[in-house]
Amino acid sequence: MRRMNIAAMAAIIGLGLSACGQQQTAEQEAAPAPAPASTVTVFQGATLIPGDGRAPIENGVLIIDGDTIVSAAAAGTVEIPEGATVIDIPGRTIMPAIYDTHVHLSADRAGVVNDLIRRAVFGVGAAQSMGRDSDELIATRSDLVPGGARYFSAGRGISRSEPGRPEGPFWIESVEEGVEAVQHLASVDVDVIKVWVDDRNGTVEKVTPEMYGAIIETAHELGVRVEAHIFNEEDAKGLLRAGLDIFAHGIRDKDIDDETEALFLANPNIILSANLPDSGYPTDLSFLEGIVPADTLAAAQAENVEDADTQETFGIQARNLDRLHNAGVTVTLGTDGNTPWAPHLELE
């Protein structure tokens, strides 16, 4: 068993790189080849969050063989393979990679690649872009980014016309146009179809029940789930009755009533991606020090202030989320933006 701490590993890597530049002697060239190194790496001493419903494991041992996790258990309950590289990380926490189900990535491939790499730094293993991605961009989903998160996409999405915006989602003004948009999105194999239903604070017309009913029905016929951007409770009720699969936001205009909870529970496969807004209370961002540029952190801190109006908005959504979660509704994480560390604030 080879035991290393992180500092020692860095030193050895540095020495190894230095040695690579030295010319081998005839004696070294004649030496027998060394035995193959073990492919097993062990991280021990950290708290492990298994992600399968079990409680966190204190003083855990995580055993990885190549690119496969073979064991996650408490110290003393599992045997460390002979020849394994052991890395001691007491005081750390290891958890499964995060799947951020609601992001808005850059508009071009180079930007998306950068976005995915930045997310991996913060433990995000997959990110789903929720609308406005071009057909050309979503065609690159299978092009994995080394060291980056996986990329999923809703494509362009569907909305009523938005004045002043020349491009973006499929603009629809009829049931027929909604159906055509779904057929196109399904043809490019989007991961989910997004529809913006609400009026965006009175700036656009709503997608009508007839429109979103046809969108949901057509998408289901084509084997694609539908996710809706909503604001108020009445729209949520209509979408639940129409068979919606996923909410891209929680209900934000009021505390939900018993009928809404009953409609959620009558749809056992419904998913709520809550996307809680800023809480309106200052947040500890010290974990970003040394990870993001100082000016980026300073800008984030400048906006990190107490705000009573934001607290009220947050309170409505937090209460609704808590009620539906306690009732048994499936909740997923989403952050609705392009901030790579945002999932950690959302989890908190």
Residue ranges and their predicted role:
Residues 1-9:
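Bacterial N-terminal signal peptides that target proteins for export
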Residues 16-19:
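C-terminal motif of bacterial Sec signal peptides marking the signal peptidase cleavage site
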Residues 21-23:
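Bacterial signal peptide processing site
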Residues 33-34, 48, 52-95:
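Histidine-rich, glycine-flanked metal-binding segment
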Residues 45, 92, 98-106, 229, ...:
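Histidine-centered divalent metal-coordination motifs
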Residues 89, 93-101, 111-226, 259-300:
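Divalent-metal coordination cores built from histidine and acidic residues
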Residues 221, 313-348:
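His/Asp/Glu-enriched, well-ordered alpha-helical/loop segment
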Residues 240-247, 266-271, 328-330:
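Glycine-enriched alpha-helix->loop->beta-strand junction motifs that scaffold or abut catalytic
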